[in-house]
Amino acid sequence: MAVNHFRFAIASDLHIALPHTVWEHPSRFHLVEYSIEAFEVVLAHLCTLELDFLLIPGDLTQHGEPENHQWLAHRLAQLPFPAYVIPGNHDLPTPAHFAPFLQFYRDYGYGWNQQPYYSLHPLPGIRLIGLNSNFFTPTGEQIGYLDQAQMDWLSQELPKSKDLTLVMIHHNLIEHMPGQGSNPLGQRYMLENRTPVCELLHQAGVQLLFTGHLHVQDIAYSDRFQMYEITTGSTVSFPHPYRLLEYRDRTLSITSHRVEQIPSLANLSEFSRTWMGDRAHAFIAKLLMAPPLGLSREETNVLLPDLRYFWADLAAGDAQFNFVHFPEPARSFLEAFSDRPPADNQVILDLS
């Protein structure tokens, strides 16, 4: 008999890094040195709840280090509920990393599959499809793309069941900010062949996508494909979020939580927001100078001081920006990043 009520959690972009593997770089954005402590805080909370499963939508490790995969696989084995994972771009830095990845996570979705995607039923009447969005071009460039073999598999798999289907994929399929699919800075977070993938999912009645990669708390809806994409921020960058979700009678209730302190850093939230603000200026400058805004360096430098926490506020979700003192067109461009419905952190989605 199909389950009509279940609870699950999402923790994304863990970037697990054991101390001896931490990559030191002066402009490093991710607080990977706190990855294990932050994840342990998440798990301590989740283990007090009656969850049916946990989803981790990619970037499980810092840079695909075997010892970091081993640590995570061992830790997931200790949980009182199943966990299901997919690879992110950081987990598969080269094509040679695919086979070991499947070995590490056989118990977390892949079983004895020879391919990095799967379909399973975590509960009666609930289907979970885990996809691999990492693709290497002939020149070795890593992009977000579903290859033809996976597209063929997906087109055959989707019609096999009319069960409620959850799809987990690392790259975004629906835009979470203005022009994400066309802006050079936003494109790399999106699946290149997202339109045919969305068409396949829509034809099968899929309404729920769970993604990561962007390190932003956002829920986007596509009118064209009648589909929600729930992307969850990273546990190693502000605001260190994770989500609890409860499905009941064709509604999905979503609540979001934050890791605000860890044993080694009582003021993690404040420290992390400052860390991000100190390192965001180069990214924000590129955003302002790139098309479609195309500001000059001089114009950009005037605006940057007031945009120190722009990305942190965006990452937190539900942001509402007001730059009334900015000249046009910069004001309209930046205010367009204000959140649009549905809400990003606490919301009930109607799936009827």
Regions found by a protein language model. Name each.
Residues 1-70:
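N-terminal active-site segment of His-dependent metallophosphoesterases
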Residues 17-20, 62-67, 89-96, 136-139, ...:
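Active-site environment of divalent metal-dependent phosphoester hydrolases
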